[in-house]
Regions:
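Histidine-centered, metal-coordinating catalytic motifs and their short helical/loop contexts
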Residues: 161-192
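Amphipathic alpha-helical interface segments
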Residues: 1-171, 195-240
């Protein structure tokens, strides 16, 4: 298979080849840091799920007099789960994209590079959809429970994410459905799609998407405080 490389593809390959060791070291350090962050987020998710399960068990035995109390507690933990799960989706998207970036920055066979390129398209297709959906749930929670909280920056970033997703919908869907997550029934279509993958296009997508999800993480992370306030409204300020 002969890939149709543009002049920019060739230029980027040269630049990457000259700096691949430094790029790889920097990415490895960043990936390790982000993996540690993800582990802390998972603890938060598991904490919420564990307490939701406790509430469910209590509700099975609850009387009509205390059922409302247990439902309120369950609701508070479900709201916290939305926050923590959104942070987890952001972190996982960042880690996955950086993993592919590491491959693209490595001295490996050409077919491995192009396999990573098509994976980038599918990863962005899948994760951007999940993030739009999850941030929608998060916005609904904030508007309902904390209507005075300023979510203007959050809304701006979410709007940018949605626009990015829509602007790149055709190319993301094409690669995902024709040569990666699915395979087109027409072999010529598969070959044509594969041969027209470009390193430059993939890097441009990565740079723009990573910027957006980094900004999204910076506006969602402070909402953990809203989760604490939500729990305090139900349990009081002694609840951890």
């Amino acid at each position: 298979m002969k890939y149709k490389k543009s002049e920019l593809d060739l230029f980027l390959q040269g630049q990457i080849g000259e700096n691949n060791e430094e790029l790889s070291r920097n990415l490895e350090a960043t990936l390790q840091y982000e993996q540690n962050c993800l582990e802390e987020i998972v603890k938060g998710i598991k904490h919420c799920k564990s307490n939701i399960e406790k509430c469910n068990k209590a509700l099975e035995k609850a009387s009509i007099f205390n059922m409302a109390v247990w439902n309120a507690k369950k609701g508070a933990f479900k709201d916290n789960l939305v926050i923590w799960n959104t942070l987890g989706l952001i972190q996982m998207a960042s880690i996955e994209i950086k993993g592919y970036t590491k491959v693209l920055s490595s001295d490996v066979d050409e077919w491995i590079i192009y396999d990573a390129i098509k994976s980038v398209y599918t990863a962005i297709y899948e994760t951007s959809k999940k993030l739009v959906d999850s941030t929608g749930k998060l916005m609904k929670f904030v508007n309902s429970e904390f209507p005075s909280y300023d979510i203007s920056l959050f809304k701006d970033v979410r709007k940018e994410l949605t626009k990015f997703k829509e602007d790149n919908k055709d190319s993301l869907t094409s690669v995902r459905n024709k040569i990666d997550a699915h395979r087109d029934e027409d072999v010529c279509t598969q070959i044509n799609t594969t041969e027209n993958l470009h390193l430059a296009d993939a890097i441009q997508l990565i740079v723009e998407y990573e910027r957006i999800i980094n900004e999204l993480g910076s506006v969602v992370s402070p909402m953990k405080r809203l989760g604490i306030l939500r729990l305090e409204s139900v349990f009081g300020k002694t609840k951890n």
